[in-house]
Amino acid sequence: MNPMISKEGVSLMLLSQLPRSLHDWSGALSCAPCWQLTNEALLPAANAHDSAWIVLFGKGLEAGHLARLAQQLDALGLEASLYPAGEQAGIPLLLLGTNRFSPELVQALKAQEWDIDLCHLAALPTLSEPGLLVMDMDSTAIRIECIDEIARLAGVGEQVAAVTAAAMQGKLEFADSLRARVALLEGAPVTILDEVAADMPWMPGLPLMVDILKQAGWKVAIASGGFTRFAGELQRALGLDAIFANELAVEGGLLTGKVSGPIVDAAAKAEALQQLASEYGVVASQTVAVGDGANDLKMMGV
């Protein structure tokens, strides 16, 4: 059954008739290269808006998110064009071009609860100009939380994992949660750090991404609430330009249960991005921050 309908001689796709899964959109929207988004439907368009951008990204991304966004755009008098649906690392992604950048839309999206990632940008970063990528490490650049692995080897895995989960959800101040978790590691042999580092699984595509960015003249760094032992391992292996992470204090070959120096928290991550952008002469529109936890939000909002 063809979900397209005709209204006053114009073919259109009602948002309510879109397949729920983005994987099924290619067939339904194959008759046009891009689509004009209204509050009720998609209309085939020969040309797309590209003055500003909206990106939607997430495992749960579906037609309902686009319909909700359409209502928001209509309320603000914004026009938008939908580009073909895609995915990155197996996660659905939608890209829309708008007729102008709207600070009001930025604030409206921030004020609402969404179960996906989305943002409104004045410009998309490009590989044709110098840029800066700053990544979180644990569960972002790598597939584990290093402190949980250390704790497991030290015999306090369950206690530390519970605090980690609360911290990632923003239920605890990051600095306090880190001190509490590290304190549980007191007396553990420093050699367990080597065990974790030796079996540290990278996110799929990480080396390729870094290589492509470096070839394009981008700078790549890590700003992590994790530890220098592991961030340093990534820096050596991937040729990262900088790392910001916490240093575990050690005495006599044992962890003391404390962190040496200032803690890298949300504010420190944001400062790291700003510092590197200034040092490397990278404009704000060419900076990208990537993270998965509450302590990454300030960095991602720079």
Predicted region positions:
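C-terminal cap/substrate-recognition subdomain and adjoining C-terminal extension
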Residues: N2-L42, D194-V302
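Cytosolic catalytic headpiece of P-type ATPases
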Residues: A188-T191
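Active-site neighborhood of HAD-like aspartate-dependent phosphohydrolases
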Residues: P125-L172
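Electropositive phosphate-/nucleotide-binding environments in soluble metabolic enzymes
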Residues: A63, N99, A141-I144, G157, ...
